[in-house]
Amino acid sequence: MADSLKMGNLSLNESQHAPAPSTASSGRAAYIPPHLRQRQMGANMDGAAPPPPGPAAAAPPQAGGSWGARPPRGGNWANANDFSPRGPNGNTSWTPTDGLRRPFNPNAYGNPGHGGGGSSSSYARGSGDGQWRDGKHIPGPPNPRVERELFGLPNDPSKQSTGINFANYDDIPVEASGQDVPEPVNAFTNPPLDDHLISNIALARYLTPTPVQKYSIPIVMNGRDLMACAQTGSGKTGGFLFPILSQAFQNGPSPTPAPAGGQLGYGRQRKAYPTSLILAPTRELVSQIFDEARKFAYRSWVRPCVVYGGADIGSQLRQIERGCDLLVATPGRLVDLIERGRISLVNIKYLILDEADRMLDMGFEPQIRRIVEGEDMPHVNDRQTLMFSATFPRDIQMLARDFLKDYVFLSVGRVGSTSENITQKVEYVEDHDKRSVLLDILHTHGTSGLTLIFVETKRMADSLSDFLLNQRFPATAIHGDRTQRERERALEMFRSGRCPILVATAVAASGLDIPNVTHVINYDLPTDIDDYVHRIGRTGRAGNTGIATAFFNRGNRGVVRDLIDLLKEAHQEVPTFLESIAREGSGYGGRGGRGGRGRGGNATRDMRRFGGGGGGMGSAPSYGGGYGGGAGGYSSGGGGSFGGAPSYGGGYGGGYGGGSYGNPSGPTGPSSWW
């Protein structure tokens, strides 16, 4: 029955598969794959005979797509008559499908031999298609679409420029120490800045320099190294981007080294030779600096690039191949690309370490030392090195001596402290009451602005955001376990206001510049007072005002002394319960957390002038503060440090980040030296 059963035209006795390629006796032509049929038709139109049937023709020749014989027509890599670009279909044929040969255009993919670092290239390239030609910088034409993307429209809430208290910055004390410190500038003018940069600054609607910019611009333009401490949100990014971009516009690109022996001199160069390198600790921060660099390099020959871990390395490599003059990177991914031979540091003129204390605290010192001292980067005397951060404790300053030469130390305002634009409130809340108090605060303040909530653990971030969603508050979360795509999407929804509540771990605490954050809530207080400074600095930026609320209980008594000092410095109200807990004697001196350095003294003074001094007493030994607190300087006097009990990663030398010293995974990794 099955032998005779037919359904429509389908028979159970007949195979529904295509017949196998026939032999010569069958008289049928060999099977030709679909992607080769058009090529065969083109060959027949040129008068070429089809491949003869039989076993020898079972596999038609592939044009450059196999390890076998090359096609019979000329122009291949063996006899190298010419090098035609790939066909329009993206296949491996070096001849267009219309059968007509196309002459090789050396400018088709950029300037051969100069694709990596932009040297000597006269072709339009860069974030705004500007050019460097005949020793002159020729800006590209305006692009309204790109301008809207980079600078936004007037009164665009996603593009923050200056706030209502910005003029008060003129009253902030500034301390600059070093030999022959240049005079500050009071406006964006030429000199010292390039005219094209000034036009981009005007597009960004920046009217006057911030205090850190007033000093950093002439210091860097005069070729000096710089260590700058400025309160968070005070324009540190512009403080280093403005002078290095201005110098680039005036001086042009550096020549790219000649290809090594055996390398071909045509096509796109695979290794990039940037002239400026900016290192920062987190993916979010390097992305933010890259966006600012694109903004101020608009219509110029300078091409900014960004590389960081957790993202597709292939797309980052393609971006680098298109040209890389200013590179923004995290230390780990940069080391990876150097090992792959895709980036050379031989042309570096400017090395910038942003959030330098965070990078060293997070255990990036081995990678930074390898990048600066172990690769082909020019010697400290042959480059300019700039360090920017909100805090610079003494032991970090001592380490910085290895990277800087004859530097100017710049301290703006109460740095290592907090901005007076931030109203700080400390509430006594037990752990089991935190959710209900948080709901009360959110109901009181509403969602008119952006609210950033900091927690200590990844699990708490997910749990709290789910709780807020169930309470009909639009919330999202970012932490280290989320993919880069998820983190970028969450930040974009938060920035745009579609999701005005963001729950974050410390991954978002350092350096992020998110406009219009009106309220920062420390749901879990950190064990390090510097982390608290970085967290609340996400609001009150660029002269705007903000509110910072901290949930405090006796579990946080390790930071009570530093918290009281911080509130007093910023002229904030000190709750009575903080003073009573401090008097109980359990919170004197140090910062625990990652080994504890102690705040002993002002963490923003120039070590060359004020010497070492002792650290704090440390916090409870179980949290790594231990005995001694800060190292207090090697030869400048002051107490040394044992670093704290090793039960929480204090170990030896607590002033170097405790358990995370030398550990690339940062403070959340295991407490070991590797």
UniProtKB/Swiss-Prot annotation:
Keyword Metal-binding: no
InterPro entries: DEAD/DEAH_box_helicase_dom, Ded1/Dbp1_DEADc, Helicase_ATP-bd, Helicase_C-like, P-loop_NTPase, RNA-helicase_DEAD-box_CS, RNA_helicase_DEAD_Q_motif
PROSITE patterns found in the cross-reference section: DEAD_ATP_HELICASE (PS00039), HELICASE_ATP_BIND_1 (PS51192), HELICASE_CTER (PS51194), Q_MOTIF (PS51195)
Organismal lineage: Eukaryota, Fungi, Dikarya, Ascomycota, Pezizomycotina
Region entry Disordered, spans: 1-151, 583-615
Keyword Nucleus tagged: no
Annotated Pfam families: DEAD (PF00270), Helicase_C (PF00271)
Compositional bias annotation for Polar residues: 10-26
Reactions catalysed: ATP + H2O = ADP + phosphate + H(+)
Gene3D superfamilies according to UniProt: P-loop containing nucleotide triphosphate hydrolases
Motif position, Q motif: 186-214
Localization: Cytoplasm
Protein name per Swiss-Prot or TrEMBL: ATP-dependent RNA helicase ded1
Function as written in the Swiss-Prot or TrEMBL entry: ATP-binding RNA helicase involved in translation initiation. Remodels RNA in response to ADP and ATP concentrations by facilitating disruption, but also formation of RNA duplexes.
Domain Helicase ATP-binding: 217-410
Residues of the Helicase C-terminal domain: 421-582
Motif (DEAD box): 354-357
Residue ranges, compositional bias (Gly residues): 586-601
Annotated PANTHER family: ATP-DEPENDENT RNA HELICASE DBP3
Organism per entry: Aspergillus terreus (strain NIH 2624 / FGSC A1156)
UniProt similarity note: Belongs to the DEAD box helicase family. DDX3/DED1 subfamily.
Binding annotation for ATP: 230-237
Entry comment, domain topic: The Q motif is unique to and characteristic of the DEAD box family of RNA helicases and controls ATP binding and hydrolysis.
EC number from the UniProt entry: 3.6.4.13
GO biological process assignments: cytoplasmic translational initiation; negative regulation of cytoplasmic translational initiation in response to stress; positive regulation of formation of translation preinitiation complex; regulatory ncRNA-mediated gene silencing; spliceosomal complex disassembly
Gene responsible for this protein: ded1
